[in-house]
Amino acid sequence: MEKRYIEFFDGYRQAYGLADFEHPEAYTDPDSGKKKPVYRWNFEKLTAQVYNSHLKGELSIGIQPCNENKEVKFGVIDIDPKEYDDFDKKFFIDIIQQYDLPLIPVESKSGGLHLCIFMNSFTDAKSVKSFLSNLLPLFKLNLIAKYFQSKQSSPGTRKQGT
């Protein structure tokens, strides 16, 4: 399974995002009781061992989709509603089915939704970003919604959004 996962979620391999639960600034949310990590870049190679640790639940990582050639094999629209109680995931699934979109909806850890698109080979990141941004109005999302960023600089200086 690890090899297949790496094929789907391949991207920038020189660093990866890390949810650091052991960081001194990590804390426990008093309302939910959940431990809140510090999110940071880990400037080490993204190896099969790191992927495997993520799949085993030992690490929580984030992968920069863009490789060094500004190409991607996957993209994600990350939907995090303000209120999770009334969040209608079926609305998004219905739109995907209605328009026969090449998206796979996956529930996120927080209870939101990731709308994932996968390519068989690395593809120009700007084209994929444009495609995903053009879908936002269908889902009644604005451009402030999060989706993957094209790699315009080092991972430590990326910009959120479009």
Where does each model-flagged region fall?
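Short, solvent-exposed polar/charged micro-motifs at secondary-structure junctions
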Residues: 29-31, 37-38, 115-117, 156-158
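Active-site palm subdomain of RNA-directed nucleic acid polymerases
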Residues: 94-106
